[in-house]
Amino acid sequence: DNVDPFPFEQAREVVEEELKASIEEVFVEFGQEPVAAASLGQVHKARLRTGQQVAVKVQRPDAAAVVEMDLQILLGVARLAERYSKALQEARVAEFALEFGHVLRNELNYYVEAYRTDCLREALARYDYAKVPFVYWNYTTRRVLVTEWCRGARLEELTRGSVQGINLKAAAHNIG
């Protein structure tokens, strides 16, 4: 996403509220500048008191409210469209909007993402070329996700060929 990050103090508030502890009690290091920002949250690099380097995904403070408002607007437009268009009524666009809302609400629950990450990690464990981060469940909540820090590259960087040392043909062959 091309989204501006939200201020560190807001990230701190979310983390401390969710973990029921100060950042300093949980982490020995916590980067104030996010390494990535998206529409629903941002990621900070940190180090746990136990020494592990981690990625801390923090949900935007207003994410749930904004998503709910947007979903209500989408559903209202879909229902209105169905009222005036037989084709859209037959396409069941309001039902689609409701399902889309369910999917998007799941995106707001970082427990769901953590569970899916664990499932993927388990499924790909036998492949040397695949790395899926370990989830630190003790520090994961609905709005904060803490995982092992993994170096990586954005998919768009890979497809542009701007990442050194990556053989895309070999990677594609390994995948499938």
Spans of features found by a protein language model:
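Broad phosphate/nucleotide-binding scaffolds in NTP-utilizing and phosphate-metabolizing enzymes
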Residues: 1-176
